Curated annotation (Swiss-Prot):
The keyword Protein biosynthesis applies. It holds the Pfam family GTP_EFTU. Increases the formation of ribosomal termination complexes and stimulates activities of RF-1 and RF-2. It binds guanine nucleotides and has strong preference for UGA stop codons. It may interact directly with the ribosome. The stimulation of RF-1 and RF-2 is significantly reduced by GTP and GDP, but not by GMP. GO terms for molecular function: GTP binding; GTPase activity; translation release factor activity, codon nonspecific; translation release factor activity, codon specific. It is found in: Cytoplasm. It comes from the Bacteria. NCBIfam families: prfC, PRK00741.1, small_GTP. Residues 8-268 form the tr-type G domain. Keywords: Cytoplasm, GTP-binding, Nucleotide-binding, Protein biosynthesis. It comes from Streptococcus uberis (strain ATCC BAA-854 / 0140J). This is Peptide chain release factor 3.
Amino acid sequence: MSIQEEIKKRRTFAIISHPDAGKTTITEQLLYFGGEIREAGTVKGKKSGTFAKSDWMDIEKQRGISVTSSVMQFDYAGKRVNILDTPGHEDFSEDTYRTLMAVDAAVMVVDSAKGIEAQTKKLFEVVKHRGIPVFTFINKLDRDGREPLELLEELEEVLGIASFPMNWPIGMGKAFEGLYDLHNNRLELYKGENRFADLEEGAKLFANNPFYEQVLDDIELLQEAGNEFSEEAILSGELTPVFFGSALTNFGVQTFLDTFLEFAPEPHGHKTKEGQMIDPLEKDFSGFVFKIQANMDPRHRDRIAFVRIVSGEFVKGMGVNLTRTGKGAKLSNVTQFMAESRENVQNAVAGDIIGVYDTGTYQVGDTLTVGKHKFEFEPLPTFTPELFMKVSPKNVMKQKSFHKGMEQLVQEGAVQLYRNYQTGEYMLGAVGQLQFEVFKHRMEGEYNAEVIMTPMGKKTVRWIKEEDLDQRMSSSRNILAKDRFDQPVFLFENDFALRWFADKYPDVQLEEKM
């Protein structure tokens, strides 16, 4: 098979949702169909000691939430599937945002009882900004939930995206009978020995069933007043195909996977800083680092740089240019993943995600190229933290471990690091409290460095240009600091302090990140 044909087989997507909507469970079921796991372990197994395959970090196993993005790969129905399971917890939005830059489509998991929740909305905005296709899986049909028509309406009103149902539930909760599959013109049955029935058979099976009659009425209404199906609108991110099912009981998941692979796009090109589009089918290898993860194997204190291959083919041992430094690097120790387990990879192509063993060479956002044509891909988004803590080592004798741990975790993007201009104190910035807890837990567990963390509360952060900097601007209402790239930054007590500063120094340009 040619490299071009291999590239066209790739389907790379992320799964996004609000916490507890069932994202990790559906990931497990997809891996089960891909033959990667013998049985799909449900996430509820905290007491039983069985954990979800994609939740591999110690703190994730303890708390049953995903706090890093896992990468998993399998072959199914002639396609090579790359799934990126993103953190559902709201505190981990930065890692999630960056992961969404490395995929060609997104699967949005929605709880049928709760509908669109805050985190789903935030993540959807990032996906919408990229203009990639979104496939919706409305989960937990085995429990009582909201009316399907109401859920579709909410999708359109809250997220502003048109929807098209690919199947329709027959009852729900204890009265759940199955799905009317509009795409394949058949019924998928929840109970009994037969999994599928044709529509004629189904009509006999559900004769006088009030739920089935309601389904027929709903479908008639959708055909008259609903959106038209359009593959073009799906691929441009304007129309989301909607699937109903139950990940926990593995119902409707395989039908979803089959249909998803029918419509999901091949690998996309990516834009450079200059606006040039790099085509996946180009001969020369290129890729970008979208994530760095330390200690995926705690026994070896390792660091892995996750690279999305944008074009061409990776071959083990190849030399690449690191555009940021202008230096060359040899890619010999490269892996592909199944959450925490990994295997050495000899070659991979555009659309694949590879893990490059990193000794401190790479940073998030780095571009790797081969050949004379050197370029940089568009920068990945950074976010503005709201919560801050002072941090210092509990044991002065452990300074070395403290600095190593902090440097590695900050490079991962788990937290942001700032240093007080006047006192030299270290400060950490995060979107939510859980990030600090994970930082503390990992510093102690992975680097044997206990830390003292002192809350500083909420701050309003703005960056300024080096040439505008005057230390006299510092006052009791703000803290002047430097970020880890040595850029000057002000941490204001509140919005009032920010406005006061802006009025006093009208010529100073204050910049806010995402």
